[in-house]
Amino acid sequence: EFRRVLFRSTLNVKKMAVKLAKIYGEDEERAALAALLHDSAKEISKDEMREILRAYPQYAEGGEERPAPVWHGVCAAILARTQWGVTDEAVLSAIACHTAGKPGMTRLDKILYLADMTSAERDWPGVEKLRKLEKKNLDAAMLAALKQTNDFVLSQGKPLDPMSKAAYEDI
């Protein structure tokens, strides 16, 4: 059941990413590829993700020092680069930062981050407002999305990823 839900979610993220790419003049194929691969490490165990982060420290972006919920994005980017032949740095960046963001996010980074937060199956208070905003102003939507994510993480009593905080301050 988890795989079916994950697959459906991935297709919804792809659809939203392509829609946003059209709006903002980003390459639709790059957006689609990033979306299709963004959660490809989601089913990997924490121990396996830790091994991947340790094996490729040059791509680990802070690795295991960061909160575990962001590891799957970084690991997905590492696997895309090392196992699946993806060489497009923009696609790899978007995959790696789709959970927490980072300072200096590109348009593609923002598109994937927002597509993941607002894809069709998402149903959280404020998602409709963010869906409208992301079609009008990418940076304003990104700021609202990062605030939503950061507030949610803090409300759960969990540590805030330093990259997420830096991304928010950067926009």
Task: Enumerate the language-model features and the residues they cover.
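Short, small-residue-biased leader/transition segments that mark boundaries at the very start
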Residues: 1-6
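Divalent metal-dependent catalytic cores for phosphoryl transfer on phosphate-bearing substrates
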Residues: 18-144
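Charged phosphate-binding loop/patch that engages nucleotide di/tri-phosphates or the phosphate backbone
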Residues: 151-171
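C-terminal beta-signal and terminal closure region of outer-membrane beta-barrel proteins
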Residues: 145-149
